[in-house]
Amino acid sequence: MGRGRVELKRIENKINRQVTFAKRRNGLLKKAYELSVLCDAEVALIIFSNRGKLYEFCSTQSMTKTLEKYQKCSYAGPETAVQNRESEQLKASRNEYLKLKARVENLQRTQRNLLGEDLDSLGIKELESLEKQLDSSLKHVRTTRTKHLVDQLTELQRKEQMVSEANRCLRRKLEESNHVRGQQVWEQGCNLIGYERQPEVQQPLHGGNGFFHPLDAAGEPTLQIGYPAEHHEAMNSACMNTYMPPWLP
């Protein structure tokens, strides 16, 4: 069964009246909060109990501003409210413009002072403050420049190390290549010389009395040009025995 209809009249029982007030008050505050959140509405709720105790809820940070807004909308005509709102917006825009204009003028004056212009109107304290500001700016510029130089130097050193390492690797590969190539040339030369020596040892020319004779020197391949020493001695003795001068009879 559904809930029965409650007759709207004052509850005579004091306890029941207080309990009903607490329940309905909490429900009303909850509904006001839900309305402000779900519908993005500006809600203000004011409740006074029969004893004069205040209960309130405001969706904004200030209940006073909401009440002032309510008064302007309630006690002024629609045209007056629109005019007041436009006037307030124009006033706020003008104030913002004046603030920005003053700030721009101040910045321009400071820039001219930093460039050394319009210094006659400055006092001693202002000049000292300007000098400190320039010193601080100069120090910051020098620090930044030094940092950039150090970073560039570090990068150059890193690149130099990379190039040096690459050069060492190339030099090592070149030395290894030259060593391997020299070893191959040496082995080919040894094989070629050994191949040419074998026929001379096995088949000597002219029965061992030829013009070219191999010499054994600790296994090293050598080549002797001409007749051996004993062959020269035999030839000299033969010439001396057979040669006769023309004046002999």
Curated annotation (Swiss-Prot):
K-box domain location is 90-180
Q: Where in the cell is it found?
A: Nucleus
Top-level taxon: Eukaryota
Q: Which Gene3D superfamilies match?
A: Transcription factor, MADS-box (3.40.1810.10)
According to UniProt, the tissues expressing it are described as:
Expressed in lodicules, stamens and carpels.
**Major location, coarse class?**
nucleus
- What Pfam families does the database record attribute to this sequence? K-box, SRF-TF
Subunit architecture: May interact with the K-box of MADS6. May interact with MADS13 and MADS18.
Chain ranges of the MADS-box domain:
1-61
What is the protein's name according to its record? MADS-box transcription factor 7
Q: Which GO cellular component terms, listed alphabetically, does the Swiss-Prot or TrEMBL entry include?
A: nucleus
Read off the PANTHER family from this record. Answer: SERUM RESPONSE FACTOR HOMOLOG
Q: What parts of the sequence cross the membrane? A: none
The keyword Aminoacyl-tRNA synthetase is annotated on this UniProt entry: no
Question: Which function does this protein serve?
Answer: Probable transcription factor. May be involved in the control of flowering time.
A Gene Ontology molecular-function term? RNA polymerase II cis-regulatory region sequence-specific DNA binding
SUPFAM superfamilies according to UniProt: SRF-like (SSF55455)
Record's keyword annotation contains Heme? no
Query: Which keywords annotate this record?
Result: Developmental protein, Differentiation, DNA-binding, Flowering, Nucleus, Transcription, Transcription regulation
Q: Give any single GO term for biological process.
A: positive regulation of transcription by RNA polymerase II
